Amino acid sequence: MASSDKPLHILDIALQGGGAHGAFTWGVLDGLLQEPRLAVGAVSGASAGAMNAAVLVSGLVSGGREGARERLRSFWKELNKSGREAGPLIPMIEAFPETTRAMSSWWTTMFGDLGMAHGSPEMGREMQDILRKVIEEHVDFAAIASDKAPPLFISATNAQSGTARIFRKDDLTTEALLASACLPLYFPPVTIDGKDYWDGGYSANPPLVPLVLESANDDLLLITVNPQARDQTPRNAAGIVDRITEIGFNQSMRKEMQGLFLLQSSIGRTRAKEGLIAQVERMRFHEIHDEETLAAMPAQSKMLPVRQLLLTLRDAGEAAARRWCEASIESLGKESTVDLASRFGPG
């Protein structure tokens, strides 16, 4: 990587959610933070992406690049530690690695489909409280709200209206982050200002339009976790539920990206170029993903922050970031490095 200490390119970063698979995003961020030619601009996130985003910004404000790297490492380490202390399942999997390879069939046998792991979402309140403690230990909301912090956009889904609420620097709280990561079959809704919220992945995964409209930067990097495509159609109930969930969590991003692609494609025929149209015209889009690695992970592992899983995904994310930097960094400020038509276009 470059030896210069002067950042040459400012990247806005949008972080998709994916439970424990968000450790891949941790690795990507760690790799990007080691690249001196890059600087972090505005950040958005949903669910696990929201956690990564808030921890990243907290670390950047308090300790710069190395502070952000250390805070992300500590956050994911504490998630694993808290998961091990909460019950016997994660210690069992870590003690018997072969269990992980059979995790999908074992989980289905014991609990049924992914969404039926709990008889009632209220049973997840204890885990919600554990996550609250981890957030409070790693996210500095005063730092996030300060003038030193980059813009931050976090999504949660209004459980009644189905619309996205976007939390910004000045109104972000622990409860907002919990809401962004509230899978309704596992956890009770998070109530904020008298309204109930579910996972932000249902409505803005991750938030993109705020980055386009409210940031002055022209390069937007998506870090995606959920595979867009699968080689085969699932035939059993558990596989079908998993794929439906995957499609659902990708849908909001696909629709936003399709809209931006169609708008950008038609700009040449538009005379009045103001507001969103003017902003979209100048945008350059990029993406880091590793569909092969993430598609091989059982869907149930998203709910299990097993140490080896987290480290494997972290390493895969860092490697993906390095590959992207080597291939694409010279294109920043010049052109998009993701083909929006083939990646997100209709069809």
Segments the model singles out, each with a brief description of its role:
Residues 43-44, 222-224:
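Short internal beta-strands
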